[in-house]
């Protein structure tokens, strides 16, 4: 019986790096780990409530956190930084609207553990968004939630990945009650090469749920990216 391992965790230290970088004594490690989770949850809640809609995804590729003694650095990699900056959030206390990024910064600052630590939050633009697995998975989820046929959605996602120029191969898998069928099944599509057993291959992976009227669909996306340590002519 085959055993499966997470493609990103399998490549840590080879082609993947941790998204959180900090050191802590053993008695304080759990508190800093919970703080990381609160920061990421704060960003996700802000995106779901104010940015993401039925026709627009947040397009956040990843969130990197670095901690020092008196400084917490949060870097948000997104396809459209202007979308996060231009979002307006209603302020109930003053009955006005404030800039969304300032609202997010204040909420993250409030989630930090007590101490005189400053927060430095930056937005970084992703040059080729549709070469990122998470952004492709969000796109597929939006299409499925809008009742677009799953085969058409997979073909369109593969086209977007190929147009980005950052994908040497892509595999998409969707599981659940597809097109409202009574019996759940798994369908997948692949184009190019996706060498999951090769550690030097730069594989990006994401699992994302889609909330449809027929239930939850599970979406998995694997992208074999161009920035791999393997040359195009090397055989595997």
Swiss-Prot record:
Q: Per its UniProt record, what CDD domains does this chain match? A: KH-II_30S_S3 (cd02412)
Per UniProt, residues of the KH type-2 domain are 47-127
Alphabetized, the UniProt keywords read:
Chloroplast, Plastid, Ribonucleoprotein, Ribosomal protein, RNA-binding, rRNA-binding
User: InterPro entries given for it?
Assistant: KH_dom-like_a/b, KH_sf_prok-type, Ribosomal_S3_C_sf, Ribosomal_uS3_bac-typ, Ribosomal_uS3_C, Ribosomal_uS3_CS
Molecular function (GO) terms listed?
Answer: rRNA binding; structural constituent of ribosome
Q: Name one GO cellular component term.
A: cytosolic small ribosomal subunit
Task: Give the gene that encodes this protein.
Answer: rps3
Task: List GO BP terms, alphabetically.
Answer: translation
List the subcellular locations.
Answer: Plastid, Chloroplast
Q: How does it assemble?
A: Part of the 30S ribosomal subunit.
User: Hey, which family's this protein in?
Assistant: Belongs to the universal ribosomal protein uS3 family.
**What taxonomic ancestry is recorded?**
Eukaryota, Viridiplantae, Streptophyta, Zygnematophyceae, Zygnematophycidae
Name of the featured protein: Small ribosomal subunit protein uS3c
| Source species of the chain | Zygnema circumcarinatum
Q: Which Pfam families match?
A: Ribosomal_S3_C
Where is it mostly found?
plastid
């Amino acid at each position: 019986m085959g055993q499966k391992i997470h493609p990103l965790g399998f490549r840590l230290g080879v082609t993947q790096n941790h998204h959180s970088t900090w050191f802590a004594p053993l008695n304080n490690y759990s508190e800093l780990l919970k703080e990381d989770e609160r920061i990421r949850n704060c960003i996700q809640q802000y995106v779901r409530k104010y940015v993401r809609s039925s026709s627009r995804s947040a397009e956040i590729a990843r969130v990197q956190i670095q901690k020092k003694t008196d400084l917490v650095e949060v870097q948000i990699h997104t396809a459209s930084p202007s979308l996060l900056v231009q979002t307006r959030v209603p302020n109930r206390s003053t009955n006005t609207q404030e800039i969304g990024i300032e609202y997010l910064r204040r909420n993250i600052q409030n989630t930090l553990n007590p101490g005189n630590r400053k927060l430095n939050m930056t937005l970084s633009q992703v040059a080729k968004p549709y070469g990122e697995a998470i952004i492709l998975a969000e796109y597929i989820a939006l299409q499925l939630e809008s009742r677009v046929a799953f085969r058409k959605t997979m073909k369109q996602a593969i086209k977007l990945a190929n147009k980005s120029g950052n994908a040497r191969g892509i595999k998409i898998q969707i599981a659940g009650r597809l097109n409202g069928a009574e019996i759940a099944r798994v369908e997948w599509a692949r184009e190019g090469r996706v060498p999951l057993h090769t550690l030097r291959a730069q594989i990006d992976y994401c699992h994302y749920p889609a909330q449809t009227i027929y239930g939850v669909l599970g979406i998995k996306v694997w992208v074999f990216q161009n920035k791999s340590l393997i040359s195009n002519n090397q055989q595997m």
